[in-house]
């Protein structure tokens, strides 16, 4: 079995943060549109009171940038 690369770790973290947002939106009865997901992630990333790992921050920024290009 090969060791996961940094890209693999980033991709898994991106999937985790997007999945979390989508499930939370579903629980609130909201439709998870890509522009709304990006907005939720921007707001969460701007919250300085929550400590995040460097990987989580990078994943959130990468997802925001990818969704902004859509």
Curated annotation (Swiss-Prot):
EC numbers for this chain: 4.2.1.2
Top-level class of the enzyme under EC nomenclature: lyase
The record ties this protein, via Pfam families, to:
DUF2767
State the reactions this protein catalyses: (S)-malate = fumarate + H2O
Keywords (A to Z) from UniProt: Lyase
Q: Which GO terms describe its molecular function?
A: fumarate hydratase activity
Q: Which domain of life is it from?
A: Bacteria
Q: What does this protein do?
A: In vitro catalyzes the addition of water to fumarate, forming malate. Cannot catalyze the reverse reaction. Cannot use the cis-isomer maleate as substrate.
Q: Which NCBIfam families match?
A: PRK10292.1
Query: Into which family does the record put it?
Result: Belongs to the FumD family.
What name goes with this protein?
Answer: Fumarase D
Organism name: Salmonella typhimurium (strain LT2 / SGSC1412 / ATCC 700720)
- Give the gene that encodes this protein: fumD
């Amino acid at each position: 079995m090969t060791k996961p690369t940094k890209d693999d770790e980033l991709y898994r973290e991106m999937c985790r943060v997007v999945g979390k947002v989508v499930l939370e939106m579903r629980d609130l009865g909201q439709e998870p549109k890509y522009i709304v997901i990006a907005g939720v992630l921007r707001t969460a990333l701007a919250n300085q009171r929550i400590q995040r790992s460097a990987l989580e921050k990078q994943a959130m920024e990468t997802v925001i940038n990818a969704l902004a290009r859509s």
